[in-house]
């Protein structure tokens, strides 16, 4: 099983780089078993959340972690005998079966990628983090989006939203009289006293909210007459809702007279018409102001272009007023400017030559320093090349040694084919033995039936003759005794076969128990039981201390 263990360790190292390869599975500790199984389960089913390590504290936590991993393995399709003892008290045989099953269940995507790249490498911490982020984002993108107010309180909290859920109910334009009594006529006051519904009656419907309606009414009274920059009333688009009068409304005296409500409606209509007229005038004035501003900007730009030309014309006119004197002044100014230029040129040359010499010196020094750095770099590279060459030779030597010491891949393949051939051969031998056993059983049944029929026939003949012949009577007794002895012999042979079968089964079971390291497992179980007893004693001492404290208090 050394080759199988090496293959298992190689696969585990590819799944989790923290699992160092060892020579055999017998050296696996419970912590290493938990880490290997959890890594394989995470690769097989990424949505599972399994513990990556075994707690080192209380035994109850260790038992719960081991039991959870055993259940996850059963959910993944493992049908073997598995429980918490598989992880806390591992034996090489059961552990080899479990790890071989998990390795067979690993996804083939990683193996295909390794085959394409020509090499296999364990997952680094960065790759594992990227894989977890990719899985998390994929799960979130596949999940259905639900608005915040449609989620439950716990769901909203888990998504970082507020746990408050406020039902939306629209506002209502309340019909409330003005607080100034002087602004209300007698008819309006009579209407609000007798016919108009109160606030609670206006917001009695479940679709309106009283507080929102009152706030809306206050905003209307405060900002209703103001205009926005776009020339629209702030709340003019909302038509006031005229509530229905109650059943106690009295009919008007005459149809020709207008009710206060109709007068208010007529006044509102007039104000609305006047407002629309004012808005149209305002739009016209705004357009006219924009055109005037455009003309002003064009005139300002044209003025800025004309001012330099005007200054030039003014200076030209001043020169042409006295041409001879102005030409003499210009010639004198040119001569003075030329002399000043020559002086400045001489001063610049005197200042420039030392700077050029200094610049050449600095360039030469810099080039020399650069050449020196290049030489030192070349020497360093030569030294590194020698070291790399020596390292390459050493690695080639180690590779040849390792290639000679380790069996190649073909050798592993050949051994696997040999194992498969031996298994097939054993299977064929088993089937052959079973067929021979069935044929022998058939022959035994046929011979037994023939003997039974022969005995019955002989028994009938001797029984008929025994009535008249003494020798026939003795022969009948001997026949009955022979039949009884033969039956006892057959039963003895059957019992011997059953005992032999049970002996072989017990021998196989004994060999299996020897391989499971029962003594080591019993020692570990004894240690765990002692830890349990110690923790129970500590709890009992704490309970007694608390009881004494309570009794004293």
Swiss-Prot record:
Organism for this UniProt entry: Drosophila pseudoobscura pseudoobscura
Keyword Ligase assigned to the entry: answer is: no
One GO BP annotation is: positive regulation of ubiquitin-dependent protein catabolic process
Give this protein's Gene Ontology molecular function annotations.
cullin family protein binding
Family membership, please give it.
Answer: Belongs to the CCDC22 family.
Q: Which PANTHER family match?
A: COILED-COIL DOMAIN-CONTAINING PROTEIN 22, JM1 PROTEIN
Q: Which residues form a coiled coil?
A: 261-404, 498-553
Question: Which controlled-vocabulary keywords does the entry list?
Answer: Coiled coil
UniProt protein name: Coiled-coil domain-containing protein 22 homolog
Alphabetized InterPro entries for the sequence:
CCDC22 (IPR008530), CCDC22_CC (IPR048348), CCDC22_N (IPR048349)
């Amino acid at each position: 099983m050394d080759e199988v263990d090496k293959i298992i360790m190689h696969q585990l190292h590819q799944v989790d780089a923290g699992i160092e390869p060892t020579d055999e599975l017998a050296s696996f500790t419970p912590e290493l078993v938990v880490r290997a199984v959890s890594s394989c389960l995470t690769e097989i089913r990424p949505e599972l959340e399994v513990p990556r390590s075994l707690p080192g504290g209380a035994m109850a936590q260790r038992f719960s972690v081991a039991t959870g991993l055993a259940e996850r393995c059963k959910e993944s399709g493992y049908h073997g005998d598995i429980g918490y003892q598989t992880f806390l008290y591992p034996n090489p045989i059961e552990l080899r079966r479990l790890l071989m099953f998990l390795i067979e269940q690993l996804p083939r995507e990683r193996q295909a990628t390794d085959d394409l790249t020509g090499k296999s490498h364990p997952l680094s911490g960065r790759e594992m983090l990227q894989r977890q982020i990719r899985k998390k984002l994929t799960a979130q993108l596949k999940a259905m989006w639900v608005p915040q107010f449609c989620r439950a309180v716990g769901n909203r909290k888990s998504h970082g939203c507020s746990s408050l859920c406020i039902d939306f109910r629209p506002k209502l334009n309340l019909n409330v009289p003005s607080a100034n009594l002087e602004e209300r006529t007698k008819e309006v006051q009579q209407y609000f006293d007798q016919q108009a519904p109160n606030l609670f009656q206006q917001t009695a419907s479940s679709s309106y909210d009283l507080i929102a309606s009152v706030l809306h009414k206050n905003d209307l009274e405060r900002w209703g007459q103001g205009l926005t920059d776009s020339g629209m009333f702030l709340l003019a688009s909302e038509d006031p809702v005229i509530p229905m009068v109650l059943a106690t409304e009295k009919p008007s005296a005459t149809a020709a007279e207008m009710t206060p409500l109709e007068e208010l409606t007529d006044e509102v209509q007039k104000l609305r018409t006047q407002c629309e007229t004012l808005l149209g005038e305002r739009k016209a004035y705004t357009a006219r102001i924009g055109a005037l501003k455009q003309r002003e900007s064009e005139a300002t730009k044209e003025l800025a272009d004309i001012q330099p030309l005007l200054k030039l014309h003014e200076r030209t006119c001043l020169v042409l007023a006295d041409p001879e004197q102005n030409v003499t002044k210009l010639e004198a100014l040119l001569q003075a400017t030329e002399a000043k230029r020559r002086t400045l040129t001489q001063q610049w040359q005197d200042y420039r030559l030392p700077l050029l010499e200094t610049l050449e010196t600095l360039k030469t020094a810099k080039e020399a320093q650069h050449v020196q750095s290049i030489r030192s770099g070349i020497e360093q590279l030569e030294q590194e090349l020698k070291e790399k060459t020596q390292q390459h030779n050493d690695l080639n030597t180690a590779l040849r040694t390792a290639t000679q010491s380790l069996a190649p891949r073909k050798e592993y393949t050949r051994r696997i084919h040999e194992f498969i051939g031996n298994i097939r051969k054993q299977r064929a031998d088993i089937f052959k033995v079973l067929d021979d056993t069935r044929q022998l059983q058939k022959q035994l049944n046929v011979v037994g039936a023939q003997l039974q029929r022969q005995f019955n026939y002989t028994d009938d003949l001797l029984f008929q003759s025994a009535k008249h012949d003494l020798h026939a009577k003795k022969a009948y007794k001997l026949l009955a005794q022979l039949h009884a002895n033969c039956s006892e012999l057959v039963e003895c042979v059957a019992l011997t076969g059953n005992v032999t079968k049970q002996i072989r089964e017990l021998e196989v079971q004994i060999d299996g128990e020897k391989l499971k390291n029962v003594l080591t497992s019993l020692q570990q179980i004894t240690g765990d039981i002692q830890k349990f007893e110690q923790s129970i004693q500590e709890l009992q001492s704490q309970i007694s201390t608390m009881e004494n404290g309570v009794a004293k208090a």
